[in-house]
Structure formats: C-alpha cells, structure tokens
Amino acid sequence: MVLDESSWDNDHSPCYPGGLHYADDKIDAFLQGSTQYDALGHLWYGGKIWNGYDARTTVGGLDKASVAPIGERGVVGRGVLLDMARHRGKRMLDKGETFTHMDLEACAEAQGHTIEPHDILIIRTNFLQAFYEEGEAFYDGFCEPGLTYSEELVQWFHDKEIPNLVTDTIANEVTTDPVSGVALPLHCALMRNLGIAFTEICDLEKLAESCAKDRQYTFLYVAAPLKVHRATGSPVNPVVIK
C-alpha cells in the first residue's frame, strides 16, 4: 500500500478541497508467478521462437510473440475439464506420473462427452495440493505429473486444432520426459511449433467439484490476460460459465 490514512500524518500528504482522503496500492510481481498465460515467445530452441522469428527478438523484451496479442483478443471458447485425478481414482496424481492423449480421450469418455476440434483443454491433476501440504519439501526431486511427449500426441493436438492447454500445474506437462530425459518438450512441440497457448497454475478444485456433481464437463471458457507490452506472460483470472 502506498497511501492510507497514516499518509496524512505528515505535511507532505496530498491535499484536496473538501478534505478527501484515499488509499492506493501498487503491485510488484512476477508476471508468471500465479495463474497465468505464457506468451508464444516464452520458450524456444534452435535459435528460433514461435513462427520462425529469431530468438534475438527476445532481448530486452519480446519484439515478437509477446503476450499482448493474446490480451488484445482474449480467449473465448468451449472448455472441457478432463479430471485425470478423479478418473484415476486418486486425490492427486503422483510426482512424475504421466498420461497421453489416449488417456485424455478415455477420461472424456468416462465423463460422458467427447473432445471436439477447437476445444480448450483443462486438465486437473490436483498436484499443487502437495505444495500446500508439504511446503518447501514440495520441490525436493521436483517432477510434476502431466502429459508426456510423443509424435502421436503432437499430431493429435494438431489434428484437433486445440488452441489453449490449461492445467493446475506449473508447467502443463511432466517436468522431465521419462523416455528422453528432456525438460519440457511439449513447451517446444505444442507452444513453439504449433502456437498453442499455455495457461498454468489454475485452481480447478471448485470447478471439478461442480462438474462431478452435475456431470457437466463442458462449458464456456473466457480469459483476458493483461496487455503487457513485450511481456513473456501475464496474470489472468479465467472464468467458466456452465
């Protein structure tokens, strides 16, 4: 807080006719430290970011593929909750536990719906619950559960034309691929190569409870990231309307 009633205890406080006082705040925060959208230029390999732009365009801020265009347009579409934790009969998925696009299809079938082209996929693992229970120990041997890379999975996302992948984990995928040992390969394959927007660290618990109760796992999904100039990401507060 930068202004409150105590600000008027000195002679340097603002003075308005009529005696108006007020409170004011400012925020100093990491743009990707909470529920957030990644910019398409957030991650790259081989010296090229999304759409073939040179990685040097990221120096000092993203001249290309920043989060601002996502903020300007917003995201609106049919959202689909895929409750992988509940589907597997678990309170939360285990550290390093993986699943594939075929598992997503099986989860959708068990929930009584299909995954259609252009759906916004929202995957619940409930793994962040471990952070609240374990504190700093959460990061020991850190490896989140999540989707794992395969050519077939990437082709499935391409064929379905999925525009947005949303999860309750920090990285939207298993942290280290168990086969190749590569870190975050789907950030490269889905975001960098296919242009799929990533939304991470979402609190899906109330939504999951609602969907389990009424068996309605599809809904209107709306999100409007901040239009931060040249930024690598933005905080966001997604809204679901059922």
Name what the model sees in each region:
Residues 1-242:
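Active-/binding-site microenvironments in catalytic and ligand-binding cores
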